[in-house]
Amino acid sequence: IYDVAIDPLMNMFTRGNTNDGGGWNIRFIHHIQSGQYGYPMLFKHFTDEIIPALQDLGGGSGTGALFLQEPTWPEKFNNVPMMCDWGRSQLIIHRVTPDGASFTQKPENFIRLAQIADVDVDGSGRLYGAAWDGAGYSGNPKKGYVQRYVPKGWKFRRFPDPAKLKDKALVELLRSASATARTAASQELLNRPAVAKDVAAVAVDRTASLESRVAAIFTYKQME
């Protein structure tokens, strides 16, 4: 496993890598704390002793991962785990649907990028993909590049430096519809223990989004 996509409610998703060879296919997994998912051998021979993956996806090389929740992106591409597959040169959206205590999923090719190694998004909503593109197994400083992606009609809006925001504005950033903004606010708030009560107020505010309340809970817990 090279990376983990974590949604705002702390569900964790991974797309495995077959670099061990010997029939270890890509598996898309919803991780539950302390779960045994069978790597490297149990899932092949002792499936009754493990928590199964949501799906075996065949060969590939899973690398970077991201859960995208950004209000600047259309609903079609938003609120989804995105997974890089280096071997397939694809950024893949996994359409996850709640199913009891877990999910079902359906993969969908999204962006083709040569040997894509990682993906990330900034506070303004710009998506970035890192292309290995023939750099070999040892790397090559003359190979590879980063590609930027934005949806049609996207307009740039500068993301504020959280460290320069006043306490009230920083706490308010926890209410953002952007996962990137909430994370940035949470990290900076840890440096300001005096506003812990204001963070707790977001956690108990029933008018706030569930995502914002969860972000406030995890922030407050670290401020204690």
For each predicted feature, which ranges?
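Beta-propeller domains with acidic blade repeats across secreted/periplasmic ectodomains
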Residues: 1-172, 180, 184, 188-191
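Intrinsically disordered or highly flexible coil/loop and linker segments, enriched in small
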Residues: 37, 195-198, 212
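Active-site-adjacent structural elements in folded domains
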Residues: 48-51, 202-203, 216
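Amphipathic alpha-helical scaffolding segments comprising HEAT/armadillo-like alpha-solenoid repeats
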Residues: 163-172, 193-205, 224
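Short inter-helical turns and helix N-cap capping residues of alpha-solenoid HEAT/ARM repeat scaffolds
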Residues: 177-178, 206-209
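Alpha-solenoid HEAT/ARM repeat scaffold
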Residues: 182-183, 211-214
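Hydrophobic core/packing positions within alpha-helical solenoid repeats
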Residues: 188-189, 213, 220
